[in-house]
Regions:
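Sec-dependent bacterial lipoprotein signal peptides
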Residues: 1-19
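Bacterial Sec signal peptide processing site at the extreme N-terminus
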Residues: 15-39
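Post-signal-peptide N-terminal segment of Sec-exported extracytoplasmic proteins
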Residues: 27, 36-84, 97
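Extracytoplasmic
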Residues: 43, 61, 69, 108-110, ...
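Conserved beta-strand positions that form and line the central face of beta-propeller blades
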Residues: 63, 112, 164
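Short, surface-exposed glycine/acidic/tryptophan-bearing loops
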Residues: 71-118
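Disulfide-stabilized extracellular recognition modules
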Residues: 119-171
Length: 171
């Protein structure tokens, strides 16, 4: 075999290898590991509901469903905390009034707030490891939820979280 044939085969092998590399798309990061530390980041509600429902199932409780009204209220709450650069329940003072105004009649509501966690996985782990937050996620009657994270780049914590879980009053 002559040298030019070896060179052609070697070049073909290199090009085939490069083409294979160019065709590979890196796998997308799971939603619970996506950073919320960007202005366009949004919590994936169904992923959060699945994660919380799985945790509840492991503790003998029923699943929760994403509720659009609770998602909107959680977003407003997280946005309010981020705007004030303050982690507090002040935004929830008229919480039941806000729920009723949104057409959501609740028998009971519980909420978790936090700041500084950059991913859903971190926020969930923090809540799971905190007895009062854990109790809220394991509230026996809860059947609906809303969750949000808001990025505030100039703030102390950068990302503010709000989770609202409720028992919808069907009467």
């Amino acid at each position: 075999m002559d040298v030019s044939r070896y060179l052609r085969l070697a070049m073909l092998a290199v090009l085939t290898g490069l083409a294979a590399c160019a065709g590979e798309v890196p796998p997308e990061q799971p939603a619970f590991y996506r950073s919320m530390a960007s202005a366009d980041a949004e919590v994936d509600g169904p992923t959060a509901a699945s994660m919380i429902s799985g945790y509840r199932h492991n503790n003998g409780l029923g699943a929760v469903e994403v509720d659009p009204d609770l998602m909107r209220l959680a977003q407003e709450w997280a946005r309010s905390m981020a705007a004030r650069d303050k982690l507090d329940r002040g935004a929830s003072r008229d919480f039941n009034k806000s729920l009723a105004g949104a057409g959501f009649n609740a028998k009971k509501t519980v909420e978790n707030i936090s700041a500084g966690y950059h991913t859903l996985a971190e926020a969930f782990s923090g809540w799971r490891d905190s007895p009062p937050h854990r109790a809220n996620m394991l509230n026996a009657g809860a059947n609906r939820m809303g969750i949000a994270a808001v990025y505030a780049p100039q703030s102390k914590y950068k990302v503010y979280w709000a989770l609202i879980m409720a028992t919808k009053d069907s009467s």
